[in-house]
C-alpha cells in the first residue's frame, strides 16, 4: 500500500544515497540487464575518454547523455551493450610519467629508467586514473558495466589493431614515405593533422624581410619574407606564382640604389613596412622568373648547400607554384622542402632534395649552428644576415602557431620517414558509405564531416614513442617489410628472441616456442619492449620490429570491433557490429568520428556505426572556456555535492540544445532543482492523502469513475508527453524531451491540475469524485516516472517505490517498459481548450487585481468577448473550472456594450489639412460618430470639400463603471466588479478559512484532526460569517464554530478585525 513519504522535503543528497543503497542491496543493475537479455540487440559504443585524471563538466555532460540514452533504450526492451571504454595509451600519459620521474627528455627514458620500467609506470598511471574516473562516473548515476570496461592496453585490443594494419598492408593502404609533418621536438615524434587541429595558439615570432642576390645581376635581389629564420639553412628555392604580375622596384638604400623583385600588388605595402622609397621600373609575369638563379644567403655556412647547387639543376632557383598567395609577404616564397608541406610538394615536382639538417630534438645536425635548438638560433641567424647585408627588415609578428596537444611545445615542420595509412585512396568510399549508411544528429554536421574527409590527407600513424600499440611491422636488413596480424602469427614466424642483448633461438613447435617465450619474457604483453624481442623469418630473411608505436587516435578508431575482441571473438562481432549509436563532443567530428570511419573502411569496406550525434562544449556562464588561469573551473563533484545528481543530470540535458555550447549556470541548475522540488511536493501531497484513505488503484474500475474534464485533460497531456519525450530522445532534440517534462510538471501538473483537484482530495470517505482524482494522479505518475527515469533515475525510483510498485509488482522503475501513448486518451481539442481556459483565468486574475478584488471574494459575472470558436467551446465545455478558478458566479461568452469616445487625430489632421485643420477638427468633434460608422466621407466646410477618413480620428472605449477588462490571446475578459452582500459574505468566509488553515499548519495538525473554532470579531463580520458557517466548518475540519472569546491557540488578524482561537478535539 501507499505510505506517507519518508522525506517531507526534497533533499537530493539524502534521497540519492538511499536509492544507491537500494540498488546495491537488490543488485538492480544486473537485474535490469538480465530482464532485457533476450531483447533485440542495441550496440551502444562508448567513445573512450582519455585517462588523464579527474573528469570535467564536458566529460560529465557526455556520460550523462550516454547514460540517459542507454536507460531509454533498455526500457524500450533492447538488450543494450553498455560497456564503458577508456583510452589508455599515448603521449599525454608519457608526458605525465616523465614529469613524475623527473626525466628531462626522451633520451633519458632509455638511459635512466629503461623502456620496460617506463612502460610499467605508464600502465600504473593509466590504471590508477581509470579507477578514479570510474568512481566519478558512478557518482553521476551512470549505469555501465564498470567491472568489464574495454581498455586499449589489453592484448586482445592491441591484436585488433594489428589485424587492422595487416588488412591495410594487404590492400596496399599501409606505406612508408618521407613527408614533411608537424614534429614535437620535446616529445620527439611526428603528429598527425587531426592532432594539431584546435592546438593553434597565439605566439610571437620573428618577421623578417631578406634579399637573395640574383646571380649575374649586380644589385638585383629576390625579396622574401619569413617568420621562421631557422628554416633558411634548408632553403633550396624561391617560389613565384606563374600568373601573378611581378615588379622590379628601384629602391634607395644605405648601400645605394638597388633593384628588388616582388609581386606588383604588394609593392606599396612592403616598401611601407620596410621603410624605404622606390619606384617600379619593370613588370612581368611570374612564369618569366622561372629558372633565375640566386646565391644562397648561408652558402658559406652550410657545405651541403654547395653540393646541392652542383648536383641539382633547380637548386637555388626560382620555381613556380600556385600555392603562392598575395595575402602577406612579398609574393616570393622562401622554399625549404624539408620544412614545409607545400615546399615539399613543389620541391618534388622540381626534383629538389628533401634537406632537413635538424634532429629529433629540434637541434641542428650540421653547419654554423650545429647543436643549437632551432628556435634559439633565430636571433643568431638574423644577426648573421644583418652582418652580411642580406637583412632588409627585422620585426615581430603575433600569430596563431601550432603547439603539441599534450606538452604544449611549439611544433616545427620537419621531413621524416613515417608510416601512413593511405586514406586518400579510400576517402571517396568513406564519404559514399557515410552518406548512405550513417544518420547524423544534427543533420548539418554530415556536410561538415564530408568536407573534412574530402580535404584530409593520408594518416601518419607512426609515432617515435613507447607507450602505445606497437607498430606490427618487421624489417629485414635489406629493407624488406612484413606486417604481423596477430600474436599467434608472430609466434609462428618467430625464430629467436633477444633478451638483454642475448639471442635465444626458438624451436619450431608452437607450444615449445610459447613455453620458452613465457619463461624468458614473462606473460604475453603486446607492448614494448616485449614485442621488440621477437626476431621473425619471412621469405628466408630475418627481421626485427620497427621501433615505432601507433598514433593513439588509431586506438580509439578501432574501438567498435576491438572492444568486441575481434578477430579473437568473431561470434560477438557478427552478432553486434556495427555500432547502433555513438555520441561525442564537437571536437570529435574531425577526430574520433573520422578515425573510426577511416579505419573501418580500410578494414571492412564499410562504416562502423549507424548513427552519430554531436554535442557542444561546456563553458562558463559568460561563454568563456573554463581554465585554471581564469579561475572559473567548476568540477562535477562540486555540482553533485551542492545540488545533487538528478538536478545536475536533468539540467545538463535541459539547458541547451545538445549540439550547442552549454553555458553552465548555477541559477539554471537551481531552476531545475525547483522543478524537481515541485514534483516532490505534488508527490508528498498526493501520497499523503492516498495513504490516509488506503487508496488502491487496482481496486477501482476506471470505466466506472466519474472523470471530470480536468482529469481527461491531464491524462491527454501526459499521453501527448510520451510522444514529445520519445521523439526528443530518438531525434537527439533532448531539450524537446526535457523541456516537455519540465513544463508538464510545473505548469500542467502542479500549477493547474493539482490546483483544480485539491478540494476533491479533502472529501471524506470513498467518494467517487475523489477516487477519480486519485486514480488520475496515480496514472499520471505511472507514466511520468517512466518518462523521467532515464533523466532523473533517483527521484523516479523513490517515488515509484512508494506510489506505483505496491500495485504493479516490478522491483524497479528501470525495469518497467517505456510507456506507449494511449491514442484514445489524447484529446487535442480539449488540450487546446484548456490552454485557452488557463489564459482566460490568467487574464481574469489580472483584471481582478486592477479592480483590487481579492480572489477569495466572488464576482457576479465574467464576460468573455471573442471571435475564436475554440475559445467559445472552451468557455462552454470548461465553464465549471472557469467559474471556480475565477471565483465567479457566471462566466459567459458575450459582448459588453461600451461608449465610444471619438476625437480628432491631431497628428494626422494637422499635417494633412494645414491651414484648414481647425475647421476639420471642429467638424470631426461634432460628426465623429457618423464618420466612424461610414468609414470615410466627403464633406463641405465653408464652401470647400474635404475627404475625411477613420485615420483622422482616434477612438477610445469607455466601459461601464462596474466592468474592468484584460486582453488575452483569443479575446478579452470583462470582470463585473459589482459586490453584493452575498458576495461579500462568501468572500469574508474564504478569508477566515484561509487564516484558520494557516493556524492548523502552524500547529502541525494532521489533515484528519478535528478542531473547535472560537472567533472574536465585529458584529458586521459575525452576521456575514454566519451565512456561510457550514462552508467554514467543512473546509477547516471544525466540529463547531462559536462567536465568543478566542480560546486555545489564539492569533489576532487585524486585517479582518478578528481574533481566532482553535483547539484540537
Curated annotation (Swiss-Prot):
UniProt subcellular location: Cytoplasm
Its UniProt domain note says: IleRS has two distinct active sites: one for aminoacylation and one for editing. The misactivated valine is translocated from the active site to the editing site, which sterically excludes the correctly activated isoleucine. The single editing site contains two valyl binding pockets, one specific for each substrate (Val-AMP or Val-tRNA(Ile)).
Motif 'HIGH' region in this chain: 49-59
Q: Does the keyword Endoplasmic reticulum apply?
A: no
Quaternary data: Monomer.
Which organism is this protein's natural source? Answer: Thermococcus kodakarensis (strain ATCC BAA-918 / JCM 12380 / KOD1) (Pyrococcus kodakaraensis (strain KOD1))
What CDD domains does the database record attribute to this sequence?
Answer: Anticodon_Ia_Ile_ABEc, IleRS_core
Keywords attached to this Swiss-Prot or TrEMBL record, sorted alphabetically, are: Aminoacyl-tRNA synthetase, ATP-binding, Cytoplasm, Ligase, Metal-binding, Nucleotide-binding, Protein biosynthesis, Zinc
Task: Look up the record and name the cofactor or cofactors this protein needs.
Answer: Zn(2+)
Q: Which GO terms describe its molecular function?
A: aminoacyl-tRNA deacylase activity; ATP binding; isoleucine-tRNA ligase activity; tRNA binding; zinc ion binding
Q: What is its EC number?
A: 6.1.1.5
Q: What gene name does this entry carry? A: ileS
Protein name per the record: Isoleucine--tRNA ligase
Major localization listed first in the record, in broad terms: cytoplasm
